[in-house]
Amino acid sequence: MTGPSADVSVRVAWADDAPAIADLQLRAWREMYAGVVPADALPTDVEAAAAAWHALLARPPEARYRVLVALERNRVVGFAITAPAPDPDCDPVADAELAELTVDPDERGKGHGSRLLQAAVDTVQADRFTRVVLWAIATDDELRGFLADAGWAPDQAHRELDLDGTGVTLVKQVRLHTAIG
């Protein structure tokens, strides 16, 4: 006898998902950037974030820009963003970027990240990309380990993001990549 299985899935995000994505993103960022970025440098206005998400989902910036959501019992528990890779050393026809892969901190370890990652790879593969890149915080060993287990590796690219435009709040990132198809 088996127990009941959770109702879990991944689908393309709808504009109506904006409030849930915004709330999840801001909560996840507080955890992800703790000790890396001063708390007051992070956005806190969920309504403003929801409005920005709604606009983005209603009118994506380009045809191959996708937002996917992981659901558990029709509740958003994670999201991923895919798009052509914007880096100057990437080929926007062949290289996709996984711009964000975020799972609700309270829902980690339940397979949502793996489902999102697979759906994101399937999506960019359907868009005929042959490689995917992702920028990770250099100290985010959890994400880097998760991606390494899935076959991703650093490609030697690195950068520092200036989050507040003053040069005070810099976040070091490394780029990971994987070949697909």
Segments from the language model and where they lie:
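Extreme N-terminal starter segment of soluble prokaryotic enzymes
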Residues: D7-S9
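Amphipathic alpha-helical recognition patches that constitute DNA-binding helices
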Residues: A20, E97, R131, E142, ...
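Active-site acidic-Proline motif in GNAT/NAT acetyltransferases
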Residues: D104-D106, K110, A138-T139
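Conserved short alpha-helix immediately C-terminal to the canonical SAM/SAH-binding motif I
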Residues: L116, D140-L143
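Conserved GNAT acetyl-CoA-binding A-motif
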Residues: V124-A136
